[in-house]
Amino acid sequence: MAAKDIRFGEDARTRMVRGVNVLANAVKATLGPKGRNVVLEKSFGAPTITKDGVSVAKEIELADKFENMGAQMVKEVASKTNDNAGDGTTTATVLAQALIREGAKAVAAGMNPMDLKRGIDQAVKAAVVELKNISKPTTDDKAIAQVGTISANSDESIGNIIAEAMQKVGKEGVITVEEGSGLENELDVVEGMQFDRGYLSPYFINNQQSQSADLDDPFILLHDKKISNVRDLLPVLEGVAKAGKPLLIVAEEVEGEALATLVVNTIRGIVKVVAVKAPGFGDRRKAMLEDMAVLTGGTVISEEVGLALEKATIKDLGRAKKVQVSKENTTIIDGAGDTAAIESRVGQIKTQIEDTSSDYDREKLQERVAKLAGGVAVIKVGASTEIEMKEKKARVEDALHATRAAVEEGVVPGGGVALVRALVAVGELKGANEDQTHGIQIALRAMEAPLREIVANAGEEPSVILNKVKEGSGNYGYNAANGEFGDMVQFGILDPTKVTRSALQNAASIAGLMITTEAMVADAPKKDEPVMPAGGGMGGMGGMDF
């Protein structure tokens, strides 16, 4: 086992704080509307330019192992906040730095680290309650657009396109971000349920222009096994032909005689049919077929529940207003399912989302919720260069996470004002002893740090602006973009409550651990072995030329 280098007490904390400051100073330069960019070197290709706090934090590794431990712990604050709320990484880093710096000073002055931590925790708990009291729910598209705009570094076009996407696919809808091919941002919306399976035969195409099979007001047959014998399908086909409606068949596979008969019927115009494979595999396929059944008001024809295909009738089929089938995708629009049944199914899937530990499963379950609840929107990010594209895409993703957080827990006035307003509730607290009370004071000073940093990045004097904001009440704050004081909500400067809350809680969590650290252990640096001297020539080799 390699030898270890161990540091204790003040020496350990000083090095750790030095590492925290290096990382936090690089990250906090990006905070606020007048925050600066940070350029990140890449091992290949052009450097990346970003104003995203977590992207900067992830790139930082320090040479000194003890300083690096401090930096890595603050990096954890940024990452955790990003995972929880999708934004607020820079705010979390600024809060953590302020708490750690003041906490380390107090420990150096002889205060009890555990009492300091208890005081900080007490203050954070009170601040979180106050943030929830200040919070207002987001009910309109305008508020959603404003949250997106602020998170995307005051880019209104991003805020507006996210609000439009949410309006079209609903709050539960899936919104994905892709790299576009043009200069402008574009929004593509797929309404209804879409899955990645196309028609099984090109003979089903009835719209030559779009090379797709379009069915109006069709019946939908859902089956979890292969269909190869046409006799099994006859009762359903006869019922559909009598009703004079088209039919969509979704099954594990349609092949052989069955597929040939369906194609012939379609070409002759006897029954308009399109057959597609069911999406997914195994249990996920069964679940998706069940989703389709709920959406269309039909039943999955499955022998597992005692339903044989040859016994199926027209009553077992689902309905939809329209179905579009292309070579790769099938879209079911406006299914005839019962709204209460759909909501119940969505609730069931949401419970599974909470219970699952796999990110992949969670993503797939969220997609299923979106397909049932409204649809899928794709934001295609436009830019003139690849470097700009990457930077812009990261901002759009941040803004999207922030708007989701805003919908979830509401919004508070932005620009660091919400934390300043929460100071009143925290200021009333008293600790069980002097050291705990000092811990509360540390949290009070730290909660001012985000506003101070926003003002400093805008080139103004932080203390002057902070005092003026403190003199006001409610939403009164400072707009660093144009130097005006006023109502932050009217200015459109809003932060999601979840983002501010997560930033404060995660910063306090790591700061508490670092303040109470008494020893640090790292691998001792390896000493370079002396180089072997060059060997002498062998005897009897004199006079040879090399």
Swiss-Prot record:
SUPFAM superfamilies: GroEL apical domain-like, GroEL equatorial domain-like, GroEL-intermediate domain like. Its EC number is 5.6.1.7. InterPro entries: Chaperonin_Cpn60_CS, Cpn60/GroEL, Cpn60/GroEL/TCP-1, GroEL-like_apical_dom_sf, GROEL-like_equatorial_sf, TCP-1-like_intermed_sf. One of its GO terms (cellular component) is cytoplasm. Signal peptide: none annotated. Keywords: ATP-binding, Chaperone, Cytoplasm, Isomerase, Nucleotide-binding. GO terms for molecular function: ATP binding; ATP-dependent protein folding chaperone; isomerase activity; unfolded protein binding. It catalyses: ATP + H2O + a folded polypeptide = ADP + phosphate + an unfolded polypeptide. ATP binds at residues 30-33, 51, 87-91, 415, 479-481, 495. CDD domains: GroEL (cd03344). It is found in: Cytoplasm. Gene3D superfamilies: GroEL, GroEL-like equatorial domain, TCP-1-like chaperonin intermediate domain. One of its GO terms (biological process) is protein refolding. Forms a cylinder of 14 subunits composed of two heptameric rings stacked back-to-back. Interacts with the co-chaperonin GroES. Belongs to the chaperonin (HSP60) family. This is Chaperonin GroEL. It comes from Xanthomonas campestris pv. phaseoli. The lineage of its organism: Bacteria, Pseudomonadati, Pseudomonadota, Gammaproteobacteria, Lysobacterales. The gene is groEL.
